[in-house]
């Protein structure tokens, strides 16, 4: 098991070094309260150039309000990271958003994602939150990962997050 590191603000740019490449061939669509898989194809070869421009200020704002950015390194290479925001989310404002969550392509399937997810869940509980709010890309394998961690569809999505990412699958994972 790789020991997690808490990133400092000046290290947030390292998040973009994670190899997010993957082939996506099935997506989920939420209809009538149920997930419906459908075929679609994306060959993701890394970060879209607009991602850094769009999300870096969001990451920095999260950090500045006390958010935690956990990272796993193999030597000098960042191989996985997760960010837990402190801003209240959800219908009762008692959830904390899993703001960023990626495992490098060559490290998937080794338990690193599960390790980081559990770390964020424990951190949310320590901060007094009822659980995690996850706004997931609709990629079937990603959503299935979250479901396997104990997430479930949230009945009432966070208004701001749903407006920002209406195609995402909005989930909640309660602290145990």
Name these PLM-found stretches:
Residues 124-137:
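Conserved GNAT acetyl-CoA-binding A-motif
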Residues 133, 147, 152-169:
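Conserved catalytic-core motifs of GNAT/GCN5-like acyltransferases
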């Amino acid at each position: 098991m790789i020991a997690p590191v808490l990133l400092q603000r000046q290290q947030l740019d390292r998040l973009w070094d994670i190899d997010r490449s993957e082939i996506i061939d099935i997506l989920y669509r939420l209809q009538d309260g149920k997930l419906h898989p459908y075929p679609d194809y994306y060959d993701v070869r890394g970060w879209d150039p607009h991602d850094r421009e769009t999300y870096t200020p969001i990451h920095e704002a999260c950090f500045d309000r006390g958010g935690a950015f956990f990272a796993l390194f193999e030597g000098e290479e960042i191989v996985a990271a997760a960010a837990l925001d402190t801003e209240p989310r959800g219908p009762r404002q008692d959830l904390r958003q899993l703001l960023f969550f990626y495992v490098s392509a060559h490290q998937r399937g080794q338990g690193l994602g599960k390790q980081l997810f559990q770390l964020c869940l424990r951190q949310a509980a320590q901060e007094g939150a009822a659980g995690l709010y996850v706004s997931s890309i609709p990629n079937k394998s990603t959503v299935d990962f979250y479901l396997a961690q104990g997430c479930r569809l949230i009945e009432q999505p966070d208004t701001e997050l749903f407006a920002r990412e209406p195609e995402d699958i909005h989930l909640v994972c309660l602290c145990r």
